[in-house]
Amino acid sequence: VRGSPRRPGNAENTGENREGPAMRTTIDFRTLATAAGALALSLAAVLPAAADGEVNIYSYRQPDLIKPLLDKFTAETGIQTNVVSASSGLEERIAAEGANSPADVILSVDIGRLDGAKQLGITQAVASPTIDANVPAQYRDPEGHWVGLTMRARVVYASKDRVAQDTITYEDLADPKWKGKICTRSGQHVYNIGLFASLIANDGADKAEETIKGIKENLAVKPAGGDRDQAKAILAGECDLALGNTYYVGLMQTNEKEPEQKEWAKAIKVLFPNADGRGTHVNISGAALAKNAPNRDNAVKLIEFLTSDEAQEIYADSNFEYPVKPGLEVNEIIASWGALKPDPLPLATIAADRKQASEIVDKVGYDDGPSS
């Protein structure tokens, strides 16, 4: 356990959706051409043409979050980094740019986005013994198109005052004893779709649907807001349990710009679901090599660097995430939540079940809230 994380300022402490808004879980290929064309026109010429000694990065991560890592990479290699940041639309932009795209590396969050980029045909495989040694197979694409860099767990936020138990499973959330006591964001949000896809993979589609429907019926209110809003609702007594990502707890605990969020964090305890069984569902932030990368060798060097021990620790610390490489220490704030036992399910399997998970969410009317 290390001391407090090396913070990149307070930019990451504000805004629930700094990694992109709530979204459906599949790319609408019918409108891709139109959207891609518009993006290409509106965002053209942001990055320079290919040049020796540089790498171009299209990133869904906030600039302040990745700057310390990129500065260190440049200091060690002499390779300059150019970054385009956005909250959405990068995949469509790369597709529109085609063979002339300057994109070398895609930095993204959520397995859905990473696998979606692969399915869109805008990534290419990387064969690297360094990456294979640093990142367990479950956090890598079997064909080498994406690689995980950090993990975040989808946990249960529980009221310290009203929930006595310290263990729970995802399946337990469907128990009628929790009726009217659960809050979540939209079931169609990528974070929940990833979790629900893991239920399909682990329990089978029928059992997963039963669980998702049960959670829906136990909701206190119609799904709304982001993960931090659920902690706020627990403090207000609107619900006792919520689904949320681990890193939001750290962001609330250290939020100096909006100190009221510290009170939200104080109201909850973190329960790691299925810790006594298969383990807790995790998702990743990760990287992919762009299909037409003009600086391919430099791009591979950057991805390899990002999987190194020091880079993973810095990257994870800056946003209260976990390194994907086993055995690396986490900072004291993360350690204070308890031990994480990750579900060993390959993330590629979760990606394959996301479409069905989205269909189940619609089928049970999850986002309509409880029936009564």
Model-inferred region functions:
Residues D161-I168, A201-E209, A293-A299:
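Short helix-loop capping/hinge motifs at secondary-structure junctions, enriched
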Residues Y191, S198, D203-P273:
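Ligand-binding pocket segment of bilobal, Venus flytrap-like solute-binding proteins
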Residues Y58-R61, P142-E143, A158-K160, Q165, ...:
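Short beta-strand->loop
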Residues D343-S372:
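Conserved C-terminal helix/tail region of periplasmic/extracytoplasmic solute-binding proteins
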Residues G180-Q188, F305-E329:
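Periplasmic-binding protein-like
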Residues S101-I106, Q124-V156, E171, I182-T184:
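A structural signal for short loop-to-beta-strand junctions that line the ligand-binding cleft
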Residues Y157-R162, A197, V282-N295, I314-Y315:
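A bilobed periplasmic-binding-protein/Venus flytrap-type ligand-binding module shared by bacterial periplasmic
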Residues D52-D115:
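Early extracytoplasmic/lumenal segment of secretory-pathway proteins
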